[in-house]
């Protein structure tokens, strides 16, 4: 049975709900993963689909977690976003279609040149030590 909007809101919290379902943006430098650099993967807070690896995370200084690439390009979808008079590329999770943030072409050139600027509220971190028990064992190879 599909979760209702209210059940989802209760499960993930108000901020995560507003970010993932209504394309809100958390305030810069307030997210729990902005200055967080432990080894593990980041999954969609709504669906649990694997999105990003700490191996691709870097400190961009933008105030949100920044990644050079998703774990797999098929895990995210890009969408044109012309809101607020800006032209940006919105990033969503493929399965749940959760709003994650935006991707820009000002990332580290030696790592592909992209900066995935992602809201902490859209993510859940799974430490390497918990990958097996949480069902993400196949991603341990990223940390060998």
From Swiss-Prot:
Q: GO: which molecular function terms?
A: peptide-methionine (R)-S-oxide reductase activity
Pfam families recorded for this chain?
Answer: SelR
Active-site residue numbers: 117 (nucleophile)
Q: Which residues form the MsrB domain?
A: 5-128
What InterPro entries does the annotation carry?
A: Met_Sox_Rdtase_MsrB (IPR028427), Met_Sox_Rdtase_MsrB_dom (IPR002579), Mss4-like_sf (IPR011057)
Q: Which reaction(s) are listed as its catalytic activity?
A: L-methionyl-[protein] + [thioredoxin]-disulfide + H2O = L-methionyl-(R)-S-oxide-[protein] + [thioredoxin]-dithiol
Q: Name one GO cellular component term.
A: cytoplasm
User: Which superkingdom, per the lineage?
Assistant: Bacteria
Q: What is its EC number?
A: 1.8.4.12
UniProt cross-references to SUPFAM superfamilies, sorted A to Z: Mss4-like (SSF51316)
User: Which GO biological process categories is it annotated with?
Assistant: protein repair; response to oxidative stress
Membrane-spanning segments: none
List keywords of the entry alphabetically. Oxidoreductase
Query: Family, per the entry?
Result: Belongs to the MsrB Met sulfoxide reductase family.
Give the protein name, as stated in the record: Peptide methionine sulfoxide reductase MsrB
- The record lists the organism as Ligilactobacillus salivarius (strain UCC118) (Lactobacillus salivarius)
